[in-house]
Amino acid sequence: MTHSGQPAPLEARKCQSLIGRVRVPGDKSISHRALILGALAVGETRIAGLLEGEDVLNTAKAMQALGAKVERRIDDKSGIVWSVRGVGTSGFATPEAPLDFGNSGTGCRLVMGAVAGCPIVATFDGDGSLRSRPMRRILDPLELMGARVTGESDGGRLPLTLAGARDPLPIVYRTPVASAQIKSAVLLAGLSAPGITTVIESEASRDHTELMLKHFGAQIVSVSDGTHGRKISLTGQPELHGAAVTVPADPSSAAFPIVAALITEGSDIVLTDVMTNPLRTGLFATLREMGASIEESETRLDAGEPMAQLRVRASKLRGVEVPAARAPSMIDEYLVLAVAAAFAEGTTVMRGLHELRVKESDRLEAAAAMLRVNGVAVEIAGDDLIVEGRGRVPGGGLVTTHMDHRIAMSALAMGCASDAPVKVDDTAFIATSFPDFVPMMRRLGADFA
């Protein structure tokens, strides 16, 4: 069900082609971090291109509740700009009411880290989907740093109350899985701790927090272990300074029109300002291995983040094997990759997808169900997803989204090229990350009704 309690069903029908030039919304990961670090900095942070989806807006509300001044302005030159006047490291105030993050696990977990280093008490809550997701992996290192947790249900589930440490301790912490959220929570708490806080990863996760901490003036060093892992060390108690941030277009959001264009005959689309951070572009690498025509141009850097213009043309795809080591760089894109695999010729095997089971829904089971109901042969073997591509998808199925925005968008992308229409039971949760998805796809030529 949706936030309002009313489902918003939609049907995607086969279209002639997708043609046009668009900019997908600002990156959700960068948007969350820009708001949080702006709130922890001294002075004003100006953010252009912020994703104005429900998840990010809930983080903005949380920053206001914790004492920062957050305003949305219209600038004659830059358009919409968000201004954040921060309270400084450790400067958060105890909020008057629980912090409600809606459906956003990223916002909730990152703010837990920021609160853990402040001598305040805050209650964290969310919607039914977020309440079902485990938080214990975030809470364990924060408790080692001196934070205290009360009121949690099984597995550290929301709602819960977090009392930040009055004298936070620097720690050396080895993450149990490749998780940018765990790493970021520890680093944000480490801002308030004296000395060096260190996070060790056996598999490198997305590095947006490290890049943005540098942009705001923190002393942080990231060193490769010579294989796939990294060691990140942060010097605590810096004075962060407000900064200008331009949020690049979200590659996770770009994934849906990209795959839709690849599988829809005659398509030729251009996506501008897409983030091309190598720790976020596993999907692009995989699609190219499958034979996708994805061309980069007009590359540039902003706040340490690379971005480029992408031209995507319809392509004949082939099945491939996707190694488990690639998962951290495309963890949010496996659902739509499964759609591409269904239209490919041959078998695609996606390995090591255990983390998909603790997302907004059990995305591993959801991906299989989405394909099966539309006539695609698919199998789950342990944590692997195996898709038998036949070059076409019969379609005709009704996809249950389980309040998951990415299931809804993946199914609608599939319907752009399936033989029969694909129906989606509820699209309202798309607003959490991509409010303009349906009208933007219609502008490109999608037939949604």
Curated annotation (Swiss-Prot):
Phosphoenolpyruvate binds at K28, G105, R133, Q181, R363, R406. One of its GO terms (molecular function) is 3-phosphoshikimate 1-carboxyvinyltransferase activity. 3-phosphoshikimate binds at K28, S29, R33, S179, Q181, D332, K359. Its main location: cytoplasm. Its EC number is 2.5.1.19. The keyword Cytoplasm applies. One of its GO terms (cellular component) is cytoplasm. The keyword Amino-acid biosynthesis applies. This is 3-phosphoshikimate 1-carboxyvinyltransferase. The gene is aroA.
